[in-house]
Amino acid sequence: MKKIATATIATAGFATIAIASGNQAHASEQDNYGYNPNDPTSYSYTYTIDAQGNYHYTWKGNWHPSQLNQDNGYYSYYYYNGYNNYNYNNYNNGYSYNNYSRYNNYSNNNQSYNYNNYNSYNTNSYRTGGLGASYSTSSNNVQVTTTMAPSSNGRSISSGYTSGRNLYTSGQCTYYVFDRVGGKIGSTWGNASNWANAAARAGYTVNNTPKAGAIMQTTQGAYGHVAYVESVNSNGSVRVSEMNYGYGPGVVTSRTISASQAAGYNFIH
């Protein structure tokens, strides 16, 4: 699936996400993601974040969550696992998601804020979890050659417990990955560059072997970078989703990394 969304977040804690269109064009990656009306699997989505940090999604494109039953529930895990406070019955795009009637009802009439306010929010943020790659630096396109990962055992993302509120800066890669794993990691691991060491100290296994559901991490760039591993293909290439990679804070994109490149990243399990 292909996706892209852009966030603007206000000091009050509300956010309005606007669809960002166009093709992704990293010089080092040559990706071509985003909504493509000619691709039957392509879509984009918007979402709002309320004062409690809850996400509310709206879909556009050739795929939407009403197809979950056709996909054997895969996307039910992908997008809804860990988000327990939503209502998908009354989206303003007209879709009906009666299967999610158990979720709480929220309105989508949050006030819109401009991009400058979003930058101001991040600059003066009270959150202390740490940052990810800065959209204004070359760390958006990190290329790792080799990294020796620390290793520790005892805890895991798959069997871990929720650590609490997301303390990472909204719009950053660290914020997205914390939510993507359902909060089953530390909320104060600092900048993305510190995550491998912090995870090992906390008892998680950290190595250079990619696996679906793991966190991909690198120390390169001003703050490092983290992404969520969606899948590992038969040829060893790794599909990841991430925030603030090339499009700025709040933008969720996905890409495929070759097996040779993936071998140079750390993976937290």
From Swiss-Prot:
Entry's localization field: Secreted
Pfam family, one: CHAP
Region (7 X 3 AA repeats of Y-[NS]-N): 83-115
Any one cellular-component term (Gene Ontology): extracellular region
Range of residues in the leader sequence: 1-27
Annotated ranges, domain Peptidase C51: 148-269
Primary location class: secreted
Keywords: Repeat, Secreted, Signal, Virulence
InterPro entries to which the protein is assigned, alphabetical: CHAP_dom, Papain-like_cys_pep_sf
Sequence repeat segments: 83-85, 88-90, 91-93, 97-99, 103-105, 106-108, 115-117
Keyword Nucleotidyltransferase tagged: no
Function: Not known; immunogenic protein.
Entry protein name: Staphylococcal secretory antigen ssaA2
Organism: Staphylococcus aureus (strain MSSA476)
Gene that specifies this protein: ssaA2
